[in-house]
Amino acid sequence: MRALVAVFWAATLAACAPQVAPTGPYSITPSISETIFLTADGLSLHKRHWLPAAEPQGVVLAVHGFNDYSKSFDVVPDAPGVGPVLAAAGYAVYAYDQRGFGKSPHVGLWPGENQIARDFADFALTLDRRYPNIPLYAIGVSMGGAVIITAMTSDDPPPVDAAVLVAPAVWSRSTMPFSYRIALWLGAHTMPSAKPSGRGLGRQASDNIEMLRDASRDLLFIKETRIDSIYGLTNLMDLAQSNVGRMPVPTLYLYGAKDQIIPKNATVIAVEKFLSEPKGRRVAFYDNGWHMMLRDLDAERVLVDIDAFLKDPSQPLPSGADIDAVERLKTAKK
């Protein structure tokens, strides 16, 4: 009888396993058109770009955060937009809706942490072919930062010359309370398609209220998330937290004192790993920075720093956010 019960529960859990979006055979050379990034398995991911008036001095591949999409790099209420600002500074800027987000297929389903890292790497390779002999940079926001870390620390990293990690998603299981880990596992394996809204958490992502209101009205911005998608994101954050100290290119790590999304303790642990090999690695801490700092009311200050870092990773940042950044991060009150 006990054996039958065990088989029953095993079958039940298997039927409720976390779902990952399907992929096709990798039989296509990735390519980009005006509005599409065609992946190696034949999926059409929506893309957008902002180009400079003259020959670009650099190419930027921007990777959005969880539940967001490429619009996050465009002009938004009360913020100038990463794409337009960097294009005006001389960069060709590209962004895409990662699979499962925005206008891309399988919206709401977790695409798999290795798959979205592969998509980033393939897009970077495609841009490298399109713009030979021009530096290629990557900017990743939250989940996008975790994607970049995972791709760049793989056995076959893409040809990126420098990276900017904006409040990267490093809230790994090792930095979570045990109760959170248990609840996440149970939720993902018993009711994976359930969509808790998170409205009762009371967390604020930015001081740009008009931008937040605009996002809340945007049908492409995901407001209710499947539990198994959160589970998949946590797998990605595990990889990012484990590998952030292995970034092989000059990298700028940004974090804000008012970030209510990625906990400070997880960030401190990640930053210590990140600086274990300090050559080419910089940290900037913004006293007035929120999680969506590239869309905050003070976003332009951060964008000026990013531009300065990409032009010369060894020079101090114009804002001074890199001065005593780690000490200020560790002593900041939350």
Question: What are the functions of these language-model segments?
Answer:
Residues 247, 253-255, 259:
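Short beta-strand/loop motif that positions the catalytic acidic residue
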Residues 19-55:
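N-terminal cap/lid segment of alpha/beta-hydrolase-fold proteins
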